[in-house]
A protein has these predicted regions:
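Conserved donor-binding/catalytic core segment of Leloir-type glycosyltransferases
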Residues: 123-174
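Short acidic/histidine- and often glycine-rich active-site loop of Leloir-type glycosyltransferases
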Residues: 181, 234-249
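A short hydrophobic beta-strand element within the catalytic core of glycosyltransferases
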Residues: 206-207
């Protein structure tokens, strides 16, 4: 098939950016299966795996943006990973990577988990996947707990700080900004690539005390790929993604 993928963020991502990584991995996997893949993303995006059509960022943000103008001839289907102001003239599906406030979505929307789909009145979902080659599975650990992701209140990072302190562990925080610190915390900032894989492989556990309905939680899979158990809450997709032998909710 001739498949087009659409992202409204530059590719590849540097630092935090789960959705962008999923798009790159999906392009890579589809090419390996023998499909012809074209990626539409902001100008400056580069992918070894697929042909990239660079889009003007200002054009993407306009309410009259029409992605059909940029699609090459012969495309069989468009898979959008960001909302489009108007439906394209080609067959397309849309993966919702967040939550809609009204809890509804179009019939051709793909959700990230059964819980995510149910909360939007659907039963159609596909779990996110990861590229195993980007992770390090390691059994001997380095004696610290890890919090990885956006330092936002809905991510529950304060509970991770409290839990690690109660257990006498050092908590490594890898996120986008630095809150007030205590001596039991170590701040890594935003990480990706090899450093992220090393932190995941070396952690005794990954904290994910989500206080919102996580659509999926890519970090959960990344931790389990690294042999690192998860400590989290029973919110959103966490009970689906974290197996009984993969962590504790």
């Amino acid at each position: 098939m001739r498949i087009a993928l659409y992202s409204n963020s530059p590719l590849p991502v540097h630092g935090y950016g789960g959705t962008q990584r999923v798009v790159v991995w999906l392009a890579r996997g589809l090419v390996e299966l023998g499909h012809q893949v074209t990626v539409l993303a902001p100008a400056g995006s580069r992918l070894r795996e697929a042909h990239v059509i660079g889009l003007d960022l200002e054009a993407i943000r306009r309410p009259d943006f029409n992605v059909s103008r940029y699609l090459p001839e012969g495309i069989d289907i468009l898979h959008a990973h960001a909302r489009l102001p108007s439906p394209p003239a080609h067959p397309f599906v849309f993966t919702l990577h967040g939550n809609r406030q009204d809890g509804t979505a179009a019939s051709n929307t793909i959700f990230l988990s059964a819980d995510h789909a149910r909360r939007h009145g659907s039963t159609t979902f596909v779990y996110n996947g990861v590229d195993p080659s980007e992770y390090i599975f390691r059994s001997p650990k380095d004696g610290y707990d890890l919090f990885l992701g956006r330092l936002h209140s809905v991510k529950g990072y304060r509970w991770a700080i409290h839990g690690a302190r109660r257990s006498g562990k050092t908590l490594v925080v890898a996120g986008g900004w630095r809150p007030s610190w205590r001596r039991s915390l170590r701040y890594e900032g935003s990480v990706d690539g090899t450093r992220k894989a090393e932190l995941l492989a070396g952690a005794d556990c990954l904290w994910m005390p989500a206080l919102w309905e996580e659509p999926f939680g890519l970090t959960l899979v990344e931790a389990m790929m690294s042999g690192t158990p998860v400590l989290g809450t029973r919110r959103g997709a966490l009970p689906e993604v974290v197996s009984p032998d993969g962590g504790l909710l």
